[in-house]
């Protein structure tokens, strides 16, 4: 029989907030919440609280927002809470050894991949771009490495051919909380089994950058289409035409590139704008010109057909 645990929760974005909400509905006691300091957001650059902070305040939980946990005062503040365990979900701060060792049962982390594959900052995006057929969440006992701790629970789900990083994020945000509650029950009951990661199978999901988002038409159409889904909603794949960057929200793979050079426009009609690639072709269905909302190909052709004349090289 598991007993309630005294939990310190550390997290920042909506993904983390959903895990905090699940903990608040469980038998366990959340005694404090750590989250990133408020950041400027929106056009007015107004200081804005994180989704995790908002939930914590709604539930009258103490909130701590240190800029770093390497500070001795911050560490002593954490130690004074006398937590059984610290649950970390997309917190955004490195935890030094003192912090990892402070809770009675250490710190556990919810990571958005099937470890040891895709350790690091962008596991959801990298798994889609790589063409992985499944992903999931791994709950691990944290150590000083980057996502290298022993694995306690793994929950998986398929990556569908239409999934974007946005849809996958939502799916994992639904999968993770249940896995977390199950894991905590096992930890509390003393039945959790920790499995070491096989470092030989590990790879790293480095942060995305805008330079990667520029479409390379020399790649295979299937790889470009995965890239478009992986980079949705940020930073969004794009191509340049008439010295303007046009974002691509949705595209489908076509088998035939008509023997044309990569980047050549093969057709442009209400079905989409078809572009030759290194292997096959890509039909662009939904696009976003600068300063505009996303629109169907037909709509952009109505206003900018000169950008997409047949034979034009992107």
Curated annotation (Swiss-Prot):
One of its GO terms (cellular component) is cytosol. Its EC number is 2.1.2.9. CDD domains: FMT_core_Met-tRNA-FMT_N, Met_tRNA_FMT_C. The keyword Membrane does not apply. GO terms for molecular function: methionyl-tRNA formyltransferase activity. It catalyses: L-methionyl-tRNA(fMet) + (6R)-10-formyltetrahydrofolate = N-formyl-L-methionyl-tRNA(fMet) + (6S)-5,6,7,8-tetrahydrofolate + H(+). It holds the Pfam family Formyl_trans_N. Gene3D superfamilies: Formyl transferase, C-terminal domain, Formyl transferase, N-terminal domain. It is an enzyme of class 2 (transferase). The keyword Ligase does not apply. (6S)-5,6,7,8-tetrahydrofolate binds at residues 113-116. Keywords: Protein biosynthesis, Transferase. Attaches a formyl group to the free amino group of methionyl-tRNA(fMet). The formyl group appears to play a dual role in the initiator identity of N-formylmethionyl-tRNA by promoting its recognition by IF2 and preventing the misappropriation of this tRNA by the elongation apparatus. Belongs to the Fmt family. This is Methionyl-tRNA formyltransferase. It comes from Photobacterium profundum (strain SS9).
């Amino acid at each position: 029989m598991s007993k309630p645990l005294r939990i310190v929760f550390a997290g920042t974005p909506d993904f983390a907030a959903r895990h905090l909400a699940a903990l608040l509905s469980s038998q366990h006691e959340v005694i404090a919440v750590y989250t990133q300091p408020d950041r400027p957001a929106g056009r007015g650059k107004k200081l804005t609280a994180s989704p995790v902070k908002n939930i914590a305040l709604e539930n009258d939980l103490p909130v701590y927002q240190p800029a770093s946990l390497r500070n001795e005062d911050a560490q002593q503040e954490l130690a004074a809470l006398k937590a059984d365990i610290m649950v970390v979900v997309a917190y955004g701060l490195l935890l030094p050894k003192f912090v990892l060792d402070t809770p009675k049962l250490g710190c556990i982390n919810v990571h958005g991949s099937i470890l040891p594959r895709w350790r690091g900052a962008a596991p959801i995006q990298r798994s889609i771009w790589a063409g992985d057929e499944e992903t999931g969440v791994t709950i691990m006992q944290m150590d000083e490495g980057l996502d290298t701790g022993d694995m306690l629970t793994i929950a998986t789900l398929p990556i569908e051919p239409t999934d974007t990083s946005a849809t996958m994020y939502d799916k994992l945000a639904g999968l993770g909380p249940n896995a977390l509650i199950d894991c905590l029950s096992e930890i509390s009951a003393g039945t959790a089994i920790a499995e070491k990661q096989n470092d030989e199978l590990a790879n790293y999901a480095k942060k995305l950058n805008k330079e990667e988002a520029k479409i390379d038409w020399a790649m295979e159409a299937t790889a470009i289409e995965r890239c478009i889904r992986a980079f949705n909603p940020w930073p969004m794949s794009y191509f340049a035409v008439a010295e303007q960057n046009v974002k691509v929200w949705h595209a489908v793979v076509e088998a035939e590139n008509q023997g044309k050079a990569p980047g050549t426009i093969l057709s442009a009609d209400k079905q989409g704008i078809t572009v030759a690639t290194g292997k096959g072709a890509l039909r662009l269905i939904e696009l976003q010109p600068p300063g505009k909302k996303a629109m169907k190909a037909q709509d952009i052709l109505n206003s900018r057909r000169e950008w997409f004349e047949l034979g034009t090289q992107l």
